[in-house]
């Protein structure tokens, strides 16, 4: 941190997940871990604000990577609608722009920005449960 404190535009980016801010039945450990990362980022952001270090937490939704495959979640490719997937480049681009602007949080992807206010509704949780259910 001492080296970062010497700079005028020091930035830290932390990647969490949209799962940090919504209940995720059957994925409670994942949601809890992402919530902890999100909370850590928010706390760090407030701690370092006085030192002119910007901390941005990114909360992406479903990102097209091989991570789902490696985690044994291949069924998500077929069950999650195409419009809910975003590519990694979009996550990086939107997160970088938010960091440069000094934002503490970014939710990459228009669809996730639109649905965020509804993520804690029971209907949204039921839809998520149906989409992610294994056959």
What is the meaning of each model-derived region?
Residues 1-6, 45-46:
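Amphipathic alpha-helical dimer-interface segment in Rossmann-like NAD(P)H-dependent oxidoreductases
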Residues 13, 55-58, 68:
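Hydrophobic structural elements of the Rossmann-like NAD(P)H-binding subdomain
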Residues 17:
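Residue(s) in the substrate-gating loop at a strand-loop-helix junction
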Residues 24-28:
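Active-site loop immediately N-terminal to the catalytic Tyr-X3-Lys motif
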Residues 33:
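Active-site helix of classical SDR
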Residues 60-70, 74:
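Short, flexible catalytic-loop segment of classical short-chain dehydrogenase/reductase
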């Amino acid at each position: 941190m001492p080296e970062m404190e010497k700079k005028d535009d020091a930035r830290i980016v932390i990647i969490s997940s949209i799962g940090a801010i919504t209940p995720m039945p059957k994925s409670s450990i994942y949601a809890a871990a992402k919530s902890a990362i999100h909370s850590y980022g928010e706390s760090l952001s407030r701690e370092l604000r006085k030192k002119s270090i910007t901390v941005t937490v990114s909360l992406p939704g479903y990102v097209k990577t091989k991570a789902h495959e490696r985690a044994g979640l291949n069924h998500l490719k077929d069950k999650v609608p195409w419009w809910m997937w975003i590519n990694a480049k979009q996550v990086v681009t939107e997160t970088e722009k938010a960091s440069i602007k000094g934002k503490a949080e970014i939710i990459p992807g228009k669809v996730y920005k639109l649905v965020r206010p509804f993520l804690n509704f029971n209907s949204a949780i039921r839809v998520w449960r149906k989409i992610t259910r294994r056959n």
